[in-house]
Amino acid sequence: MNLQEIKNIATSEELIDRALRRASKVEEKVRNPDYRARLTAVRKIHSVADNLANPMISYVKAFPSFDSIHPFDREIIDLTVGVDMLKKSLGAIDWARKEILMISTKYVPRARARQSAETTMKIMSEAYTKMTNVVRQISKSFDFLISARSIFRNLPNVDTDSPIA
């Protein structure tokens, strides 16, 4: 296991900004304005959810599984950042990912429903707000993972598989 190879982790605000910026570029080219609004809203909700959830799962997978790592590595993690705090932060990020996907699946059918463009945009805005609030709720977990990553990058790389002769 190499703790130095953990990829860069974005802050919660950077993640939100990136997701909303990418979603703003999504548009449908349909003549009927109500239908266009529904299609665009659905695609934008999916875009925001994907651009928030996909980096989160990669952050969780970037850190080692504590059940399968060498006891020495586990002790190093525990002494530097604390295994319990790291597990808590990773768990919070995984919870937020699941919550965002659940919000997306809840709001997409509502955005698809036959209604005016104005109502559809309100539903889309509500979905955006809920998803970004979930990410902001766990901003301290992102900050902790960023600091843990910087601490891990400064640690020496010790090969625990080869014998010390």
Question: Can you name each region flagged by the protein language model?
Answer:
Residues 162-165:
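Glycine-rich phosphate-binding P-loop
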Residues 1-96:
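N-terminal accessory targeting/assembly segments
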Residues 147-160:
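Pre-Walker A adenine-sensing motif
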Residues 11, 113-119, 157-159:
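Intrinsic-disorder/low-complexity, polar/charged segments
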Residues 90-149:
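Charged, amphipathic alpha-helical linker segments immediately N-terminal to NTP-binding catalytic cores
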